Amino acid sequence: MNISKKALLIGLIIISCIVIIFFNYSNNIKSEKNHDKIFVESNDQANLKEISFFNLDQEEFFLSDFNGKVLLVNLWATWCAPCRVEMPSLDRLEDILGDESFQVIAIAVEKTDISKIAEFYQEEGIENLKIFHDKSTKSGLYAKAAGLPFTLLINKEGKEVGRKNGPWEWDSEEVLEIINELKEIN
């Protein structure tokens, strides 16, 4: 191989490395910007109304049972450390804003017995959230999750308006403002 071919090959390798570094750097910047958002806007309008889950008495509920309410639907598990950390803020959010027009629905998605979830609520002093469970973990919501905790914000018409992967302080001023704005929309 002559010198000009070697120089060309080395040049292509250097340019390829620069391109790879640039794309990795720009993707990191984008993910940091998204991480700073509370909710990532979603255009996913899959039918959420038929998503089912159970309460402590093993009664089946569907998201459509809550039509007319703004919902903050949180998927979590007792074994998930970030989920356990954010549960008190979800409980406070339900205490602050929970009424006929808004509800936090925290659905434990795990194969454990629902009594273990009730024990967790008692140990952590969770008083305002109702106990909901999806033991099958086959919920359509679970399929949307990139991991736990996973939270959807749903408007009164039952349409997803935003989602959050990962934990958050759900009783923060920013969240209260967003939910209050949605509650006011007819």
Give residue ranges: language-model regions.
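Thiol/disulfide oxidoreductase modules built on the thioredoxin-like
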Residues: 119-127, 133-181
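Residue-level recognition of specific faces of alpha-helices
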Residues: 79, 86-89, 150
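Short active-site neighborhood of thiol/selenol oxidoreductases, capturing the structured segment around
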Residues: 61-84
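Active-site acidic short loop of glycosyltransferases
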Residues: 66-69, 99, 126-128, 145
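Short, solvent-exposed cationic patches
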Residues: 85, 180-186
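Structural microenvironment flanking redox-active thiols in thiol-disulfide oxidoreductases
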Residues: 84-124, 134-141
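Short extracytoplasmic
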Residues: 38-69
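N-terminal targeting signals for export/organelle localization
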Residues: 1-50, 186
